[in-house]
A protein has these predicted regions:
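Membrane-interfacial helix termini and adjacent extracytoplasmic/periplasmic loops
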Residues: 3-7, 46, 50, 55, ...
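Transmembrane alpha-helices
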Residues: 19-20, 25-32, 123, 148, ...
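C-terminal transmembrane helix and the adjacent membrane-cytosol boundary/short C-terminal tail
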Residues: 2-19, 159-174, 180-189, 242-274
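Short membrane-interfacial helix/loop motifs at transmembrane-helix boundaries
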Residues: 30-65, 215-220, 274
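Transmembrane-helix boundary motif in ABC transporter permease subunits
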Residues: 2-10, 79-111, 128, 167-170, ...
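Hydrophobic alpha-helical transmembrane segments of multipass integral membrane proteins
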Residues: 26, 68, 72, 76-88, ...
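Loop-to-helix entry region at the N-terminal start of transmembrane alpha-helices
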Residues: 69-76, 128-153, 157, 193-195, ...
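Interhelical loop and adjacent transmembrane-helix boundary motif
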Residues: 6-13, 43, 58-66, 208-258, ...
Length: 274
């Protein structure tokens, strides 16, 4: 807030900083904003100015067998990879948070390494691993590797939630005769649920938008929506790609709003525990 006691230099800095932040934000979102109007263009090319308003390219998207197959594949792969990432990521986060053993930092670095290793390296390594097994072009390999990419997000969000977890609740449940499984299901899991769901949403978004690994591991029958968009850009540049991109943008916005809601809920739960 602008203070009435600011000097002229402080006022210039105040407004300059906000203008700079606005320009950076515009630079980041402008490519996204550019693609949306093109999806409603009545013309057959991805060019400005727009020739008119039309929903033809959305109709083409939903009427195309190739686009629908790629969408179906994404709906198969992303939820399956998310479930795997959520289960293994949550268990790993609990073990790494509560455990105290030699090499703990090294193990943590290894399990979150897919976040920092270039995806193309993961794609090549995955292909060299699965291809000799005859699983190079299969949903199995695609789901497993997508889950590996999503696990670090779950570990980080769940670990952050566990930092404010009151372990006296677990001890109290155990003292009342609850088994470890019952304690986890009825005490631990409800309290760390915002972190688990947040990580799962990140894992889902990562899998749903991933294209590099998919290029290495997916055949024509396993092509996901991002790969179909990539192929369309190379082979047949059509505004249908803009329609697909707009749908992905809308989906991403919904995910971000959901994550923000979960973050607020997590803060309330943490405050209530204190």
């Amino acid at each position: 807030m602008l203070s009435p006691y600011m000097s002229p230099v402080e006022r210039v800095w105040f407004y300059s900083l906000r203008i700079l932040c606005g320009l950076i934000l515009l630079f980041l979102i402008l490519p996204v904003l550019v693609i949306v109007p093109l999806s409603f263009n009545s013309g057959s090319f991805l060019v400005y100015p727009l020739q008119g308003f039309s929903l033809h390219w959305y109709q083409d998207f939903f009427a195309s067998a190739e686009w629908m197959r790629s969408l179906k594949n994404s709906i198969i792969v992303a939820p399956a990879a998310t479930v795997l990432a959520m289960v293994f990521g949550t268990l790993a986060a609990i073990g790494l948070t509560r455990g105290d053993f030699p090499g703990k930092s090294l193990v943590m670095a290894l399990v979150i390494s897919p976040m920092v290793v270039p995806v193309v390296i993961i794609g090549v390594a995955s292909y060299l691993f699965f291809a000799p097994l005859g699983l190079g072009n299969s949903f199995f390999s695609l789901i497993v590797v997508h889950a590996v990419l999503g696990v670090p997000f779950v570990i980080i969000t769940v670990s952050a939630t566990l930092q404010g977890f009151n372990h006296n609740l677990v001890r109290a449940a155990a003292s009342l005769g609850a088994s470890p499984l019952t304690t986890f299901r009825r005490v631990t899991l409800p309290l760390i649920a915002p972190g688990v769901i947040s990580g799962a949403l990140f894992a889902f978004a990562t899998s749903f938008d991933e294209v590099v690994v998919t290029l290495f591991l997916a055949g024509p029958e396993q092509a996901t929506l991002p790969r179909q968009m990539f192929s369309g850009i190379r082979e047949n540049l059509s505004p249908t790609i803009a329609a697909a991109a707009t749908l992905l943008i809308a989906f991403s916005v919904i995910l971000l709003l959901t994550l923000e809601w979960l973050r607020g809920r997590s803060e309330k739960l943490r405050t209530a525990q204190v």
